[in-house]
A protein has these predicted regions:
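Short loop/edge segments at beta-strand edges and connector loops
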Residues: 28, 114-116
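Long, positively charged amphipathic alpha-helical accessory segments at protein N-termini or as interdomain linkers
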Residues: 1-2, 19, 95-112, 122-239
């Protein structure tokens, strides 16, 4: 695979937004882009600040699972948000980002869908993980950090995950410019986020989301920390 330059400048050049990703921080290696964003928040980083790393030494996913991928072939990034809505609405931003990633990947010509609630999948295998974390101060949101990991040009998936995960390269045989994909994700996210804050629900994105839902009318298992349960994915509604 040819190596496409990947740094602050090459990423910034692909981001055509008003605020999402307009400030980019890039590191060859970091503990976690989410933790980095939290540190940037304490330094008064602005809404929409984007932290991108080539490698994470302490990346994590949902339910506290460790998340590590080889450097050079994936996207590892986190965006810092400073919303003024109530904390109870913040968790829905995970779905907003999931939709945004799926829309961006679709724009590359890939047949992509969303496995409820927010797994972005190609050929029914996961290509993306999203972790949303919130910091509070005096009962109000200080920051929301959304971490995104996308398997872009990975040529191999570790053996124990081959039936569950894949990459854009493995599914299409094509290599993709990570700078371009980050720019597409930021553009989609900015538009979707601005829809979300109008109503603090997903009502303005329901049709877009349900159209991309992979497991509609299929059984799903919800891995709640306290009480896992099963059900049928019918799509999303306003709540």
């Amino acid at each position: 695979m040819s190596v496409i330059p990947y740094n602050t400048d090459t990423i910034s050049n692909e981001i055509q937004t008003e605020w999402a990703g307009k400030t980019v921080h890039f590191a060859k290696e970091i503990d976690s882009t989410n933790e980095w964003c939290k540190r940037l928040s304490k330094e008064d980083a602005v809404h929409g600040t984007l932290a991108v790393a080539e490698f994470q030494s302490a990346g994590k996913g949902r339910l506290g699972r460790r998340w590590v991928v080889p450097e050079g072939n994936s996207i590892m990034m986190s965006i810092l948000l400073r919303p003024d809505f109530e904390p109870r609405f913040a968790s829905m931003l995970t779905l907003v980002m999931g939709l945004s990633v799926a829309q961006a990947v679709k724009e590359l010509g890939v047949d992509v869908s969303i496995k409820w609630p927010n797994d972005v999948v190609v050929s029914r295998k996961k290509i993306c993980g999203i972790l949303t974390e919130m910091g509070l101060e005096d009962g109000k949101i200080r920051e929301v950090v959304i971490g995104v990991g996308i398997n872009v040009n990975l040529a191999e998936i570790q053996e124990d995950l081959k039936d569950k995960a894949t990459s854009l390269y493995l599914e299409t045989g094509k290599t993709y410019d990570r700078n371009l994909l980050i720019g597409l994700v930021m553009g989609k996210f900015e538009k979707n986020y601005e829809k979300f804050v109008q109503t603090c629900d997903l009502s303005l994105m329901i049709d877009d989301y349900n159209m991309m839902l992979a497991n509609k009318c299929q059984p799903v298992r919800i891995l709640d920390k306290l009480d896992p349960y099963e059900g049928v994915a019918l799509g999303i509604d306003r709540e």
